[in-house]
Amino acid sequence: MKLLYFNDFKLGVLKGDAVVDVSAEVAGIAHTGPGDLMNNLIEQWDGYKARLEAAVAKGSGVPVSSVRIRPPVPGPRTIDCMAVNYMEDGTRSAPAPINAFHKSPSAIIGQGDTMVLPDVPAAIFEGEAEMAAVIGKKCSNVSEAQALSYVFGYMNFIDGSARGLPPPGNVFFQMKSRDTFAPIGPYLVTTDEIANPQKLQIKLWNNGILMQNFNTDDMGHNIAKSIAWLSSIHTLLPGDIVATGTNHRGLNPFMDGDKIELETEGLGRLSFNIKDELKRTWARKTRLQCHEEAREKTPGAYPDFTPQLTGKYAK
């Protein structure tokens, strides 16, 4: 099932090219807003799944193109993001030590929304194409063998980043938790629709140009291991988001006016816009292109990204 919020956060289910309003079927779930409605629905899923399926079977819905799609999981209690979690197409000899960071839930935006680049001296702004797992039940100290049974569903996720901010060592919080730096959606797909989450192609386009193109089978620490490890540190609750990392080789600068599209196989296509009032610019190059060009000029050089060309903070 593909769950989504639309218009004024009505709960819907995707049915082909239409969305069926199922708000009436979940009216009995205690909630104060769309965030805890989704979290509580996930927690009580066994009692509502058949009811929603029946409503979808009977309903014709309205064209999904006629509605405004909202973030499908607008109020997670936490967003845990796996760090350096891909083998980078075999260029790493071994996985990096397992690691993660928190991203603020207030960073979430959805389909058609705008990521706003702040007035800070970042070396570059990027967005990492990722697949996220959404937790389905309370999860604490679970084994790797059990971990996937705690997943409710999957969705597209962008890990927005303002890289290179001073001072050195003061990194993840101010780089990752900016408002609008967590686009998700367009919908949440339940696990029964995803045969193998470790074999999904992920693609990201910037203004229609394919920039990232990799598979979840390139993860250094798979989804089950990641969830098991995270749950050994803190309890995960229904609706919590686990972003599983990215292959960095296709990362590229996000700039004012860009249209970004992210599609993970089976999870739909998320699109959103970029706004930068300072109109800063960078060369339109991926990290892989930067590496290859630098090595041609200086053997052993390995720059992560292209320098800023114009605008405030350019050097």
Regions found by a protein language model. Give the residues of each.
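RNA pseudouridine synthases
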Residues: I135-K138, V142-F157
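Catalytic-pocket segment enriched in acidic/His residues
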Residues: Y48-E53, S60-R68, P95, V116, ...
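Structural signature of FAD isoalloxazine-binding scaffolds in flavoprotein oxidoreductases
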Residues: A94-Q111, G127, K259-G266
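Residue "hotspots" at secondary-structure boundaries inside conserved domains
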Residues: L4, P71-P72, T78, A123-F125, ...
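Short, conserved beta-strand element in jelly-roll/cupin
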Residues: F101, A132-K137, A228
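A generic local secondary-structure boundary/capping motif
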Residues: M1, R68-P71, E88-G90, V116-F125, ...
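Residue-level recognition of short, solvent-exposed, well-ordered loop/turn junctions
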Residues: P74, G110, E126-E128, L237, ...
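N-terminal non-catalytic cap/leader segment that marks the start of a structured domain
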Residues: M1-I98, E261, T281-K315
